[in-house]
């Protein structure tokens, strides 16, 4: 009888711990989604304010440039469409999100300097800090998915492509400033999509269509 009670106690403790871990993971996922949503909204606000500050002819010229431009993230392996995104594992989506956020930590310093003080976007110098916080959160989620298993993804140890890709952009170069902002918005949209799908995929009953 005593052994049965001990066994029951251990089972209850295990259930309690597992439920607590699941609850904490959900909180971290929700927090990560909220953080990247804010960054995506901030990116959209920045580029909208930037475009509003341009002359009509400048705006028309820039609208033809970006679709043909190359972003740093284009060298980071990632799903190329909705179907591929939905078929990707939670761990893969988290790893890609981590790489994308990491790729902006250093260039975000240039991003802050590119933005005119006259633009009403708040304090752009906080972008680097927000990216660093999100990176830490995603790292914790990745460790949770690994559940103690070694990280076998070789891409995690690879250097980021073109680390100084955005750092040569001059503050007075209209085309390159727009390119910087447009790439930032594009990448934050990617990360938001990947984290939303990853969060949804954790619930088997959820409809994770994009």
UniProtKB/Swiss-Prot annotation:
Zn(2+) binds at residues 38, 192. It is found in: Secreted. Residues 1-22 form the signal peptide. Keywords: Disulfide bond, Hormone, Metal-binding, Secreted, Signal, Zinc. The keyword Mitochondrion does not apply. The keyword Zinc applies. Gene3D superfamilies: 1.20.1250.10. Belongs to the somatotropin/prolactin family. One of its GO terms (cellular component) is extracellular space. This is Somatotropin. One of its GO terms (molecular function) is growth hormone receptor binding. PANTHER family: SOMATOTROPIN, SOMATOTROPIN,PROLACTIN. Growth hormone plays an important role in growth control and is involved in the regulation of several anabolic processes. Implicated as an osmoregulatory substance important for seawater adaptation. Disulfide bonds join 71-183, 200-208. The gene is gh. Pfam families: Hormone_1. One of its GO terms (biological process) is response to nutrient levels. The lineage of its organism: Eukaryota, Metazoa, Chordata, Craniata, Vertebrata.
